[in-house]
Amino acid sequence: MKASELRAKSVDELNGELLELLKAQFSLRMQLATQQLSNTSQIGKVRRDIARVRTLLREKAGQK
């Protein structure tokens, strides 16, 4: 997900997105552990998306 798309979202929406991404990351890690994950680059993509969302949440918290 692009940062420009995330900037348009509210804090509540970003928190929801963060929760979904953390669940997806957990699921991917479990698939990796059980050798069911074929595309391991997904883990890195989700990790970077989590970082983007957390960065924007931090920016919005600083603006208040």
Swiss-Prot record:
Keywords recorded for this protein, A-Z: Ribonucleoprotein, Ribosomal protein
SUPFAM superfamilies given in the database record: Ribosomal protein L29 (L29p)
Similarity comment text for this entry: Belongs to the universal ribosomal protein uL29 family.
Protein name, per record: Large ribosomal subunit protein uL29
Gene3D superfamilies reported for this sequence: 1.10.287.310
A molecular function GO annotation: structural constituent of ribosome
Gene expressing this chain: rpmC
InterPro entries: Ribosomal_protein_uL29, Ribosomal_uL29, Ribosomal_uL29_CS, Ribosomal_uL29_sf
Species this protein is from: Azoarcus sp. (strain BH72)
Assigned GO CC terms: cytosolic large ribosomal subunit
A GO BP annotation: translation
Source domain of life: Bacteria
One Pfam match: Ribosomal_L29
